[in-house]
C-alpha cells in the first residue's frame, strides 16, 4: 500500500518514517516538510545519517500531495491540518492523525484548545477518536484521531478502575514527560532543562478534557499536573484515587488483568518487585501499567515512550488493525533502550 507522512520532519513524523522503512505492507512514497521541501529525507533527519537505505525520497510541499496514496499519517503541528484537510481528503480517503486537531467535537472544548479546528465547517470531514486497545473503528470516518501521549498514559492507568466502578469518581493525574513531548519548536533551552525538574502545567492542559472524554461519565473531577523531566523521551503517569468501600486489592488486580490480558502492547505488571520503568518502554510500542492499593487509596502508574506508543507507534498499530494486518507488523522488533 502506498502511504504518505504529513509533517515528516518533526519528532513524531521522523519516527513514523523510521517504523515504516521496514514495514512489509506500507510503503512511504510521499513525505512533507515545508522547511525541507526538495531536500533528501535521510540527509535532513539526523537519525538516518548512517543507515544507508538510500531510498532517494525527498521532502515535498504539502500542496504537492499526489492522488495515488491509499492513506496518510498526519504528524503536522497542531493547527496546520485544519487548514489543509479538505484538499488532503480530495486526494486520499483516510488520515491517521497524531496531532491534536479533530480529537473533539464539542464546540466549547475546541474553542479553548483547538480553535483552528472549530473554524472548519465541512460535511466532507468525518472524524473519530480511536484508542487501539479500547475502541472500534468507525468505517465511515476519514480522519482517525489517535490520543495525545500524556492522555494515553493516563487513560491506560485509570481505565480499569473507572470501567469497573471500583473507585470514587474524582481522580488526580500526575504526569512526568521528557523534552521531546514539546516538539522541536519548544522555547525551553538545554540550560533550562538540564538537571532540572519542574511543574509546567497545572489543572489546565489540552490533554485534560481528552482524559475525561475517554473515561466517560463514570469519572468525576479530573485534577491534572504535568512536570518536565530532564530526559529526551518518555512519559510516566500516576493516577491517584480512592477505592470504594468494600473494594479489595484483589478486585483491583483482577480488573487490570482482565482489561489488559489480551492487549498486545500493554503489559500489566503483577510481581511485587515489578514496576513500570521508562527504560523498559522507551524505544518500544509498549506501555507498562501497575496498580497498588493501600488503606483505601490506589495509585496506578504507566510508563511509555511518547514518540512511539504515544504517537508514531500507536498510529502504525492502528493502521495495522484497520487493514486487518497482524497488530504488531513493523513494530515487533522494537526493543527497549536498556540501560
Curated annotation (Swiss-Prot):
SMART domains: Semialdhyde_dh (SM00859). GO terms for biological process: L-arginine biosynthetic process. Pathway: Amino-acid biosynthesis; L-arginine biosynthesis; N(2)-acetyl-L-ornithine from L-glutamate: step 3/4. The keyword Transit peptide does not apply. It comes from the Bacteria. Belongs to the NAGSA dehydrogenase family. Type 1 subfamily. This is N-acetyl-gamma-glutamyl-phosphate reductase 1. It comes from Lactiplantibacillus plantarum (strain ATCC BAA-793 / NCIMB 8826 / WCFS1) (Lactobacillus plantarum). The gene is argC1.
